[in-house]
Amino acid sequence: NYYRDQSDIPLEERRKTNYDHPDAMETELLIRQLMNLKAGKAVDCPVYDYTQHTRSDQVVRVEPKKVILLEGILVLADERLRDLLDIKVYVEADADERILRRIIRDVKERGRDMEGVVEQYLTTVKPMHYLYVEPTRCMADIVINSGKNPVAFTLVKNTIQKILDEAE
């Protein structure tokens, strides 16, 4: 995960981080590592500790492949990153679905309480979605509505297959 390392900041301050703003991301590192993967070089991807609100000491070794899948709500927000992508997919979900998924994930996997998740959603997640995420919809090659579009899935699959065929 490419959230910035915040180990030099007190935990109470880290808890206030707006993770839905592009400044929370270490985009330069992501771009560098994606370029290395595309050049056939392995990379050590950082691992983020959501309970401590900072990067952990662990890394995940990622080997280069013919197809590299990159996902994240802010992936299309940076032009330099968009320019490195062969196909750009925007997955659309309505606001109710987004908040329900977030509550379930953050309570189950990140040790958060529901009240805190709802407050964060209303104060940062929702406004940042409309400011930084939704405007990137028009930059996508394909828009998929929460997995309910088999034609879009077929287009993505066929595009990936074409990339694989050309790589051989």
What are these regions (language model features)?
Residues 1-40:
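N-terminal phosphate/diphosphate-binding loop that engages ATP/GTP or pyrophosphate donors
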Residues 39-41, 63-64, 104-107, 126-168:
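NTP-dependent small-molecule kinase module
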Residues 30, 98-101, 154-155:
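Short, charged, surface-exposed secondary-structure boundary motifs
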Residues 33-68, 76, 164-167:
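Phosphate-binding/switch loop-helix module in NTP-utilizing enzymes
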Residues 56-110:
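ATP-dependent NMP and nucleoside kinases share a basic, alpha-helical "lid"
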Residues 23-31, 82, 92, 111, ...:
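Amphipathic alpha-helical transducer elements in NTP-driven molecular machines
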